[in-house]
Amino acid sequence: MASLPHCLSARPLVVAAAPGRPGPGPGPWLRGGARRRNAAFSAGNAGRRVGLRRSVASAVEVGVGEDEEEGVEEEEEEVEAVVMPERYALGGACRVLAGMPAPLGATALDGGVNFAVYSAGASAASLCLFTPDDLEADEVTEEVPLDPLFNRTGNVWHVFIEGELHNMLYGYRFDGMFAPHCGQYFDVSNVVVDPYAKAVISRGEYGVPGPGGDCWPQMAGMIPLPYSTFDWQGDLPLRYPQKDLVIYEMHLRGFTKHSSSNVEHPGTYIGAISKLDYLKELGVNCVELMPCHEFNELEYFSCSSKMNFWGYSTINFFSPMIRYSSGGIRNCGRDAINEFKTFVREAHKRGIEVIMDVVFNHTAEGNEKGPILSFRGIDNSTYYMLAPKGEFYNYSGCGNTFNCNHPVVREFIVDCLRYWVTEMHVDGFRFDLASIMTRGCSLWDPVNVYGSPVEGDMTTTGTPLATPPLIDMISNDPILGDVKLIAEAWDAGGLYQVGQFPHWKIWSEWNGKYRDIVRQFIKGTDGFAGGFAECLCGSPHLYQAGGRKPWHSINFVCAHDGFTLADLVTYNKKYNSSNGEDNRDGENHNLSWNCGEEGEFAGLSVKRLRKRQMRNFFVSLMVSQGVPMFYMGDEYGHTKGGNNNTYCHDHYVNYFRWDKKEESSDLQRFCSLMTKFRKQCESLGLADFPTAQRLHWHGHQPGKPDWSETSRFVAFSTKDETKGEIYVAFNASHLPAVVGLPERPGYRWEPLVDTGKPAPYDFLTDDLPDRAHAVHLFSHFLNSNLYPMLSYSSIILELQPDD
C-alpha cells in the first residue's frame, strides 16, 4: 500500500487550487475563474456544489506563496470546491483533488484512489463511478468532470478521489471530434473502459446476455484496494531452461467444461486446477493458455448464434477473463483475479509453468462499424494503425490493427506484460500474429503516414522494421528479459517471418515450417527427407545463422488453428459448414492424409494406420531438438469432425472429452511415456545444435543416409549421457523395410518403441509383464543387427550391454 503523495495531502479540499502546478499567481484562482473548475458533477447526477468562504490566508494553505499575497486584498471570496455526496454507495463523503499523471490506471493510495488516463485528442473528460447495481441498470452513479487546466498534465487526464471507494467501479467519458475520416471517434455519450483497468465488469454468467438481451452491456473497471489479500504461499518462478519444456496448448474453459470432467466448477480457473495432476502425469511442465484476457464471448451473438469461444478478440489486456471465474463478477472482479493467481500458484506447485497467449495485434472494437468500448473512444488515432482518410489497416484480418510501435502503445504493452509477470506470476507469453508488432506505426502525421524519407528509404505505415521499437523495448526490459517470449511469426497481411523474426537472441518462434515439413514427410510425400532431418536437428537452417539455438524453435504438428492430430489423419479436406460461412473459412492447405478413406467411419486397416500415424507424429515431436508443443486432447485423439476453425463453438467439439480419454487410454499412455522418455534423454534437449561427433545419419543400411528426392526413410543414432546411445528411424513409405543397425561390439540393440506394434507393445516399459517375451520375438533379427519395420512406422532402440 502506497502513501498519499505530498502533492495530494497538502491540498485537502479546494479543487480550484491546482496541486502540483508551479507558481501561478492568485488572480486566476480567486477572481472568478475558480467557479468553473470542477465545480459540480454533470447534470442528472447527484453531485452538489459546496460554497466555501476563505481568506487569502487560506489560499496560502493550498499553494499560494507569501510573495504572491502582496497586493491581494484581505477580503473573503467564495470559491467553489467539490465534495461528493454522502451516499451509501460511496461509504461517506469523498473529496476531489487534482491527482497525478502517473502511474496510469487506477491506483489505490492512503486515503483514496488516483485515476490517470492517456488521451491526446480529447477536449474534455470526466470520471464516471458506478455501483455494481447501477452498472447493471446502465446508470452512472457519480460523474466527475476533469478540468483541463487542473486535471491534465501533457496528454494525461488525472484526478484523485479522497475517501472510501470500496466496491465501486469506474470508466471515463471523453468529448472531442467525432470524425471517422480524420481518425477520431470521441463520443461523450459512451462510457469507455480504462485500458489499465485490472478487472472489467459487465455480464456475470458466461454466454448469457445482459439485461434486455444486450450482448454488449455497459462495462466498467474495478477500483483497486490499497492492499492484497491473496496468499502466494511463497510462490516463485520455476525458471526452467527453455530446452527442457514440454508445452501443452490448452483452452481454459474447454479443458473442464465437459460434464465428464466431474469437477465442481467446470470451465473455470478453479475447475482447471482440479486437473493439473493429470497434466503432470502426462509429462507436461508448461501450459500455454489460449486467451484469458477479458473478451466478449457473445461478440458475434447478436447477428448469429456463434460464440467467440477461443477469445482472440481482447477488450482489456490487464483483466483476466471474468467469466472463467467461479465467482464471476462477485466482489467487483477481485475473485476472478485471485482465482487466476490460484491457478498459477497451484500449477507452479506441480512443476508446471504458465505461458499466456496474448493478442496485441488487434482488439474487439473491430473496424469503423465496430463498438466503441475503450481504446477507440479514448484516442483512436493513437491506439490503431490508420490510413490517411481514417481507414483501419487490417493486418490482423479482424478489422483493425493495434498500433504497437507507437510510443504510447508500446509503453502500454510493456506495462501490461510487466503486470502479468510481477502481479500474476506468469512465466511467459506467446504473442499471437506477432509480426504485426514489427510493423511501423502510424502517428497520424501526414508526412509519416504517406512516407517520410529515412536514410534515403521510404518508411510507411505498416512497413516491417528491422529493429522494431516494441520488440527492442520488451527484449531489453529488466523485468521481461527473464521470461519466455514466443512469437507467432506471421500475420494476416502476408508477412511471414519464421526464422527471421527480430529476436535479440531471446525470442522463440512457433515453427510453422516444422509443422509443414513433418506433415509432408510422415504422410509419405517425396522430397522431404532432408527437410525432415533438419527439423529433427532443431531447424538449424532457420536459427543457427542468426545466433539462436534449437530451443528457439517451438515445434508443433497441430495447434488450436487447423486440424487436430486425429483429424489430420482422418480428413483430406475441411468440414467447416457449421461455422456458418459456407465452408469458406479456415485453412485449405492442411497437408493432411485420411489414410485411404475419408471420415471417421472407415475400415479396420485404415483405422490401424491412423493410429500408427498419430504415434509417428508424436514420436517425431518428442525426438526433435527444440521445444515440443502439442494441443489439448491430441494425446487421446480428440476429433472436431474435420472442422479446422472451431473458434465459434462452445460445446463438445471444443471440450476436452474426459470420457474419450478413458476410451483411448492406449494413445494417452503412449504419449505420456514419450514425453517422459524425452526428459530422460539428455541428447533430445540439447542446448546447441547436434554435431557430427554426436549424431550419425543412417539409411536402410547404417551410415548410408538417403537424401534423394524419392527417399521416405530417415534414421539417426545419437550418444546420450543417460541412455548411452539410442537409434531412431522413420519409415514413411507404403512398403515395409528391414533396417540394418549400426554395429556396436559388446552391445546389442533392444527395442523400446515401435509404432507398428499394438498397445501396449508400442512402448515396452520395464514393468510390462511379458516384456522379455516381446523382446525375444525380435532376437533373431537383432542378433544380426537388423530390425523389421512396417510401412508408415517409427522405432526407437536403446543400446544395451551384451549379456
UniProtKB/Swiss-Prot annotation:
Reaction(s) the record says it catalyses: Hydrolysis of (1->6)-alpha-D-glucosidic branch linkages in glycogen, amylopectin and their beta-limit dextrins
Pathway in which the depicted protein is active: Glycan biosynthesis; starch biosynthesis
Alphabetical list of SUPFAM superfamilies matching this protein: (Trans)glycosidases (SSF51445), E set domains (SSF81296), Glycosyl hydrolase domain (SSF51011)
Subcellular location: Plastid, Chloroplast
Record-level GO cellular component terms: chloroplast isoamylase complex; isoamylase complex
Biological process, per Gene Ontology: amylopectin biosynthetic process; starch biosynthetic process; starch catabolic process
Mechanisms controlling activity: Inhibited by copper chloride, mercury chloride, ammonium molybdate and para-chloromercuribenzoate.
Top EC class for this record: hydrolase
GO molecular function: isoamylase activity
Keywords: Carbohydrate metabolism, Chloroplast, Glycosidase, Hydrolase, Plastid, Starch biosynthesis, Transit peptide
Site (Transition state stabilizer) residue list: 561
Phenotype of gene-disrupted mutants: Replacement of endosperm starch by a water-soluble highly and randomly branched polysaccharide structure called phytoglycogen.
Residues at the catalytic site: 432, 488
pH dependence: Optimum pH is 6.5 at 30 degrees Celsius.
UniProt note on tissues of expression: Highly expressed in developing endosperm. Expressed at low levels in leaves.
EC nos: 3.2.1.68
Range annotated as the organelle transit peptide: 1-54
InterPro entries reported in the protein's UniProt record: GlgX_Isoamylase_N_E_set (IPR044505), Glyco_hydro_13_cat_dom (IPR006047), Glyco_hydro_13_N (IPR004193), Glyco_hydro_b (IPR013780), Glycoside_hydrolase_SF (IPR017853), Ig-like_fold (IPR013783), Ig_E-set (IPR014756), ISOA1-3-like_C (IPR048650)
Function statement: Starch-debranching enzyme involved in amylopectin biosynthesis in endosperm. Functions by removing excess branches or improper branches that interfere with the formation of double helices of the cluster chains of amylopectin and crystallization of starch. Works as ISA1 homooligomer or together with ISA2 as heterooligomer. The heterooligomer ISA1 and ISA2 possesses higher affinity than the ISA1 homooligomer for various branched polyglucans in vitro, but no marked differences exist in chain preferences for debranching of amylopectin and phytoglycogen between these forms.
The family this protein is said to belong to: Belongs to the glycosyl hydrolase 13 family.
Subunit structure and binding partners: Forms a homo-pentamer and a hetero-hexamer composed of five ISA1 and one ISA2. Interacts with FLO6/SIP4.
Protein name: Isoamylase 1, chloroplastic
Organism name: Oryza sativa subsp. japonica (Rice)
